[in-house]
């Protein structure tokens, strides 16, 4: 059994949660999110807490209910605090600029990479080598950060590229003479 799944998700004041069938809807000060839970998982809202339990005693249901509980907890955290990912750009001439709804990245290619910012995501560039991604849906924030990082992932020899702010790059030694 999942230790994460056993804990109920408390709904703080200022946040309203509702369960309609397999859909969990959460509305808070930062916005509104919803998540459709798998059919093998049972979700209930009682006394300001969302509880998640496996509907059947199958391996699949036991595997899914901890994930479903974590998703519901992310919904509640997203509408109250929001999520943020920070990226750092390392390399000579590598930089990022905002142009309206687009993020323009100079990453050493013959052309600039233009990334269109999706709805519900706010990107700021405090320095040309830093990118902050903020949003209420943790899955979308993580996906946007991963897509931007994928344009030039950090390489192990010089460490050039786009990396997460807390990411450690294992450096390799160059070839020897």
UniProtKB/Swiss-Prot annotation:
Cellular component per GO, a single term: cytosolic large ribosomal subunit
Domain of life: Bacteria
Gene3D superfamilies: Ribosomal protein L6, alpha-beta domain (3.90.930.12)
UniProt keyword terms in alphabetical order: Ribonucleoprotein, Ribosomal protein, RNA-binding, rRNA-binding
UniProt GO MF annotations: rRNA binding; structural constituent of ribosome
GO terms of biological process kind: cytoplasmic translation
Pfam families given in the database record: Ribosomal_L6
Family the entry assigns: Belongs to the universal ribosomal protein uL6 family.
NCBIfam families xrefs: L6_bact
Quaternary structure and interacting proteins, as annotated: Part of the 50S ribosomal subunit.
Function: This protein binds to the 23S rRNA, and is important in its secondary structure. It is located near the subunit interface in the base of the L7/L12 stalk, and near the tRNA binding site of the peptidyltransferase center.
This protein's name: Large ribosomal subunit protein uL6
Organism this protein belongs to: Rhodopseudomonas palustris (strain BisA53)
Taxon lineage: Bacteria, Pseudomonadati, Pseudomonadota, Alphaproteobacteria, Hyphomicrobiales
Gene name tied to this protein: rplF
């Amino acid at each position: 059994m999942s230790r994460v799944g056993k804990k109920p998700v408390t709904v703080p004041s200022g946040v309203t949660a509702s369960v309609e069938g397999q859909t969990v809807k959460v509305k808070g000060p930062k916005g509104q999110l919803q998540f459709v839970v798998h059919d093998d998982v049972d979700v209930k809202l009682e006394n300001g807490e969302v509880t998640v339990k496996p509907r059947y005693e199958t391996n699949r249901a036991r595997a899914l209910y901890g994930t479903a509980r974590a998703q519901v907890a992310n919904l509640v955290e997203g509408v109250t605090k929001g999520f943020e990912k920070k990226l750092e750009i390392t390399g000579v001439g590598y930089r990022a600029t905002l142009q309206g709804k687009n993020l323009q990245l100079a990453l050493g290619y013959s052309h600039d990479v233009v990334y269109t910012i999706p709805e519900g995501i706010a990107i700021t560039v405090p320095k040309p080598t830093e990118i902050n991604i903020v949003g209420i849906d943790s899955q979308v924030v993580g996906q946007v950060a991963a897509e931007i990082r994928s344009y030039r992932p950090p390489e192990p020899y010089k460490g050039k590229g786009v990396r997460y702010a807390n990411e450690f790059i294992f450096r390799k030694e160059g070839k020897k003479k």
